[in-house]
Design a protein with these regions (language model features):
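Beta-strand-rich interaction surfaces with strong enrichment in secreted/lumenal proteins
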Residues: 1, 40, 67-68
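Contiguous beta-strand segments within globular domains
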Residues: 1-21
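A structural detector for beta-sheet-dominated domains
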Residues: 14-16, 29, 55, 82
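Short, aromatic- and glycine-rich surface loops/edge beta-strands on solvent-exposed regions
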Residues: 24-28, 72-87
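Solvent-exposed serine/threonine-rich low-complexity stretches and specific carbohydrate-binding patches
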Residues: 35-53
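Signal that preferentially marks extracellular ectodomain short beta-strand elements
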Residues: 52-72
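Short beta-strand elements
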Residues: 85-117
Length: 117
């Protein structure tokens, strides 16, 4: 997995497989509150970040796309990384991580908080 840095100095998850229009998702689940966030990128490989969807699961009882950024609180999360490897398969790996200010999973140096673009 690669972490890219945008022009606004925010770091975001990024990985693309070889298929022309892959589906990529990062899911974070807080181990204590069970609050869940997902970040989806359905852009073509050649044009990343042109088709993004941000969802805070359960925000209004259903999955709701967000136009603003999502702040992810410092805490203990299960981080699921999904990558579409073929037209029919969506693989995932699970990593367990404590998220602290300053780590480079998703980081905004403006407010020292977890932020999805």
């Amino acid at each position: 997995m690669t972490i890219l840095q945008s022009a606004t100095n925010d770091l975001i998850f990024y990985k693309k497989s070889g298929i022309s229009s892959p589906y990529y998702l990062v899911r974070l689940v807080n181990r204590i509150t069970a609050k869940e966030f997902v970040f989806l990128d359905q852009s073509p490989v050649a044009c990343p970040f042109i088709s993004l969807q941000l969802i805070e699961v359960g925000r209004t009882g259903t999955e709701s796309p967000l136009s603003a950024s999502i702040k992810v609180d410092t805490g203990s999360y299960d981080i699921y990384l999904y990558d579409q490897v073929s037209s029919t398969n969506l693989d995932y790996t699970l990593t367990n991580s404590l998220l602290y200010e300053g780590e480079a999973y998703v980081y905004s140096d403006e407010d020292l908080d977890r932020t999805f673009l």
